[in-house]
């Protein structure tokens, strides 16, 4: 695969930022959503190196969704994500990307007894107690029973209490 720049023309005020999408299986609607918010999106293959990514001069990195066990990508994804932390730029992810971010921080993932699949999944924001109705399709979750002091849980599933979001407070 090669690096692609996604330029879908939507009429919305955008944040002037170049976000690199690491493609672990990203869906087109995710790219549309990102491009509606940021001025430039570059999609790179999941096997891209740290040097490949920084050569694009990112303002942020998005770790995409994708299939399967997050620990199976440890040989190529985790080392790159750990190096990206040194850039001190926003790194965010959904689904598999969220799980890879957690693994890169030393957290663990586990296979869920019953995965989350489909629409209408209520997720609680622990910062303000608001609830969003989401669509999900994953069978793994992040274990949060032993979070380091620099990581906090931000979102949980109201179906089973499993983790749906984390935030790194300090990388130093």
Where are these regions (language model features)?
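RNA-binding accessory domains that recognize and position tRNA/RNA substrates
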Residues: 1-56, 68
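Residue-level preference for short coil/turn positions at secondary-structure junctions
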Residues: 3, 14-15, 57, 87, ...
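Active-site-proximal beta-strand elements of phosphoester/diester hydrolases
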Residues: 18-23, 134-135, 172
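A generic "binding-loop/recognition-motif" signal
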Residues: 26-27, 49, 97, 138, ...
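Conserved beta-strand termini and adjacent loop/short-helix elements that scaffold enzyme active sites
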Residues: 44-46, 112, 137, 156
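Cysteine-nucleophile active-site neighborhood
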Residues: 60, 65-144
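Catalytic beta-strand/loop cores that center a nucleophilic Ser/Cys/Thr
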Residues: 129-171
């Amino acid at each position: 695969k090669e690096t692609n720049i996604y330029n879908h023309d939507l009429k919305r005020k955008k944040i002037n930022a170049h976000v690199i999408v690491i493609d672990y299986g990203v869906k087109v609607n995710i790219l549309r959503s990102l491009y509606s918010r940021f001025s430039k999106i570059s999609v790179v293959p999941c096997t891209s190196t740290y040097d490949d990514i920084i050569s694009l001069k990112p303002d942020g990195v998005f770790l995409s969704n994708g299939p399967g066990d997050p620990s199976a990508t440890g040989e190529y994804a985790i080392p790159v994500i750990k190096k990206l932390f040194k850039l001190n730029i926003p790194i965010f992810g959904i689904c598999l990307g969220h799980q890879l971010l957690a693994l890169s921080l030393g957290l663990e993932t586990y296979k869920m007894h019953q995965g989350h699949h489909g629409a209408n999944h209520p997720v609680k924001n622990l910062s303000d107690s608001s609830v969003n109705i989401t669509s999900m399709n994953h069978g793994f979750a992040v274990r949060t029973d032993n979070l380091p002091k620099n990581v906090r849980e931000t979102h949980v599933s109201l179906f089973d209490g499993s983790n749906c979001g984390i935030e790194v407070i300090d990388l130093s």
